C-alpha cells in the first residue's frame, strides 16, 4: 500500500485529505499549521485539516517552521512514498520535496501558470475571469512553478463569490487528485513545463486592497465585492465610518456625479456612481461594530441622503 503524507490547513484542503483516505491510501501522517487564537476571546483553535485527521486517528504534525531541520526530519521519519499538499501555507524545504519515491505534488486552485500564489480564488473573481480550475503539479522550491501533471477547468458564474467558488474548487481538486495519483504511480503522466511568459501572480490580499475604488468601472467594483466575499470583505467609508460591503448589484446609471456619490435611495438599497455608466446598488452591508445586515434594515436607522459620498477617508 502506498504511504502518503498530506500537508494542508484550511477548509479547502479537507475534501482532498478525505478523498485520499476514501481511496484507500495509507495516510501515515498529516502536517498542518499550529493551532491559532480565534475570535475576540482568542480561543486556541485547531485547523480544519487537523480536526479531520483526528477523526480518522491519523498522526498530526504542526511545525511552526517546516524548514527547520528538527521539524522536517519528523516528516521524513514517516517514510512517505508520496506527499500531497493543498494550501499548506508554508514553503516546503527541498529535503522534503526530494524524499518521496513518487515525489511531492500540490493541488492548486488555478489554471497554472496563471495565478500562482496564496489567493488564486479571490483574484480569479476580482479579475472578472469566466473560468478557472485546478492544477496538480510537482512541487519545487519556487512558488507554484513545478511541472504540471493534470488540470481541470471550472466555470465561474456571474454571481459567483470567493466562498462559493472555494467550495466548487475544493471538490474539483479532490476529484482530480483521485484520478491523478493512480496515473502518477503507474508512470502514465507526462509532466508539462509551465510557460514562464504566461505567469501571473495572486499574492495574499493586503488590507489596502480591500477598499473599494469607486473610480473603477461598475463591473470592476462588482467583481471586487464578489471576490472579497465572504472574506476578508470589501469595504468603503460613509460619513467617516468604515462600512463593509457584502453585496451589490450592477445597475445602469446615467449620472455625471463624482464616483462614490449616492444618486438614488430605494427601499432595498442605494445606488452609488462608479467610473462608468454601470452603478452599484448596495444591498447588503455591515457598519462598523455591527452585524451584517440588508440595506433595507440599514436604511431604517441610517440618515442617508442623495449626494452623500462613499470612499472618503475616515
Curated annotation (Swiss-Prot):
PROSITE patterns, A to Z: GART
GO MF, one annotated term: methionyl-tRNA formyltransferase activity
Keyword annotations: Protein biosynthesis, Transferase
CDD domains linked: FMT_core_Met-tRNA-FMT_N (cd08646), Met_tRNA_FMT_C (cd08704)
Reaction catalyzed: L-methionyl-tRNA(fMet) + (6R)-10-formyltetrahydrofolate = N-formyl-L-methionyl-tRNA(fMet) + (6S)-5,6,7,8-tetrahydrofolate + H(+)
Leading EC class: transferase
One CC-aspect GO term: cytosol
HAMAP family xrefs: Formyl_trans
Described function: Attaches a formyl group to the free amino group of methionyl-tRNA(fMet). The formyl group appears to play a dual role in the initiator identity of N-formylmethionyl-tRNA by promoting its recognition by IF2 and preventing the misappropriation of this tRNA by the elongation apparatus.
Protein name (database record): Methionyl-tRNA formyltransferase
Originating species: Bacillus cytotoxicus (strain DSM 22905 / CIP 110041 / 391-98 / NVH 391-98)
